[in-house]
C-alpha cells in the first residue's frame, strides 16, 4: 500500500497505460484499443494488475489513479485518431470512480484538453460496479451515455455479469470473458454459449466483443 501511495505521490511513477488492439473479426482491421494499466514497482518490479488494482479500490487510491488512467488513455487516443478518425479507446472505470461527483466533469475536461470526441471513447465496467448502490451506478452510466460515450459490459458470463444485469444496464457493447473464448475450438459448450450471447445481443442492438 505504501509503495502504491509513493508512486501516486511522485506523479504516478511506475504506472503505464498500454493499448491492446481490438480488431474486426471478419476483416482483421483495427477497430480500436483497450487501455490496460500496468505498474512497475521500484522495489519488486512489475506487479500484476490482479494484485494491485484491488488494493487501489479498497484504499480509495483508485480515484486519483483512475483519473490519471482516463486522461492518459484519452491522450493516446488523440494520437491514434490522427491515423484513424474512427478509432475507439475503451477505458475501464471502477465502482469507486462512479461515486465521485467530479468524475463526469473530469471526462469532459479530458476530452476537451486532448481534442477527442465522445464517439471515440468507450467506458467499460466490470462486476464490481454491481455489488451495491446500483441506482447511483446506473444513473452515472446514463449520464455518460448522454455525452455520446458508449458503455461496455466487461467480463460477461462471470460473477455478477448475468442476463439480469444485461437487461437492466444501458450497455451498448458486451465483452464476453476470455474464459469462454480460449477453448472455443474444442468446447462445444463455449461455442454454444458465445453463439447464444452474440445472437441475443445483436437482436437487441448490442455490439459484442470477444476477449
Where are these regions (language model features)?
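The cytosolic transmitter module of two-component sensor histidine kinases
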Residues: 1, 66, 100-103, 107, ...
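Active-site core of bacterial EAL-family cyclic-dinucleotide phosphodiesterase domains
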Residues: 1-55, 92, 153, 210
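Cyclic nucleotide signaling catalytic output domains
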Residues: 3, 51, 55, 72, ...
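Catalytic core of bacterial c-di-GMP phosphodiesterases, primarily the EAL and HD-GYP domains
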Residues: 24-34, 61-137, 211
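Catalytic-site-adjacent helices and loops of nucleotide signaling machinery
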Residues: 45-49, 58, 153-166, 190
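Conserved long alpha-helical elements within nucleotide-processing catalytic cores of c-di-GMP signaling
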Residues: 53-54, 63, 138, 142
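The catalytic core of metal-dependent phosphodiesterases that act on cyclic dinucleotides
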Residues: 110-184, 198-211
